[in-house]
């Protein structure tokens, strides 16, 4: 077994998984908010035991300060590990990057697209990663990243309309959806924001002629019930946790361990 540490440093949380380069499952996983990033060292120490990984593949969209902090923690808990900071390129793990400037594509979007391709090989797919921002990207059946769209995430969209954070509408995953014509302001904000998110995903799915829609991200459990009502997506919707991490793992699986 060759263990790798995968790290996904997003805008809100840092997620990680310890994986075997030759296996599908994860050996361990965890996460921490940026404010609690110091907890990662303890999580990693527990997961690694006496055998820290020799290789790390990390995607970071949270800036250079977060990268520096992660490098310091990795040096302490996995000294000598070879660390690759994942960046978008013209092609990787069987996915061709169709961006006009491939290096300009966010590494999280490229990783998510690689993950979607690995989960739905040979199929036209749309992957929606619903976090601080919602990204909706298209991959064709031949394995080419076609492009995509970026819009404010569900929370950001709602907070821009609410008067203050204490008045943000609250919803539990799987709860009843608000009426599309709400009779109170909180539900009206929520209905509008959910409709905007779901509508953008449905439109992308239709325009791409996709046969599968992969939904991921922290807001996915809130958006999924509305998408489940869309006849266009019947039988095509799949909720997948940690799609960026799935993409990083797909890279490790595809490329194996370096000699």
Regions found by a protein language model. Give the residues of each.
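Active-site neighborhood for divalent-cation/phosphate handling
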Residues: 82-127, 133-134
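Adenine-nucleotide phosphate-binding core of ATP-dependent small-molecule kinases
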Residues: 30, 177-213, 237
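Glycine-rich phosphate-binding loop plus the immediately following alpha-helix
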Residues: 105, 112-124, 146-189, 251-255
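Short hydrophobic/aromatic-enriched beta-strand-loop microsegments
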Residues: 78-85, 145-151, 232-243
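Glycine-rich phosphate-binding loops at beta-strand->alpha-helix junctions
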Residues: 13, 59-66, 191, 210-227
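N-terminal glycine/serine-rich phosphate-binding loop of ATP-dependent small-molecule kinases
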Residues: 1-92
């Amino acid at each position: 077994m060759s263990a790798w540490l995968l790290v996904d440093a997003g805008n809100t949380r840092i997620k990680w998984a310890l994986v075997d380069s030759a296996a599908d499952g994860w050996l361990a996983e965890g996460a921490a908010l940026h404010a609690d990033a110091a907890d990662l060292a303890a999580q990693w120490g527990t997961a690694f035991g006496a055998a820290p990984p020799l290789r790390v593949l990390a995607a970071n969209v949270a800036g250079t300060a977060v990268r520096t902090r992660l490098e310091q923690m990795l040096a302490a808990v996995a000294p000598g590990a070879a660390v690759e900071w994942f960046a978008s390129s013209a092609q990787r793990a069987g996915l061709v990057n169709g961006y006009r400037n491939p290096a300009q594509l966010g590494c999280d979007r490229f990783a998510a697209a690689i993950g979607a391709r690995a989960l739905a090989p040979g199929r036209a797919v749309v992957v929606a990663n619903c976090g601080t921002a919602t990204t909706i990207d298209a991959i064709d059946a031949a394995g080419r990243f076609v492009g995509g769209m970026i819009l404010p995430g569900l929370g950001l969209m709602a907070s821009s309309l609410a008067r203050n954070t204490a008045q943000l509408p609250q919803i539990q995953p799987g709860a009843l959806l608000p009426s599309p014509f709400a009779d109170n302001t909180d539900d009206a904000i929520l209905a509008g924001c959910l409709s905007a998110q779901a509508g953008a995903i449905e439109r992308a799915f239709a325009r791409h002629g996709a046969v599968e829609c992969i939904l991921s991200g922290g807001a996915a459990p809130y958006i999924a019930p509305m998408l489940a009502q869309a006849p266009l997506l019947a039988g095509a919707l799949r909720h997948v946790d940690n799609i960026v991490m799935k993409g990083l793992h797909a890279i490790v699986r595809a490329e194996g361990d370096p000699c």
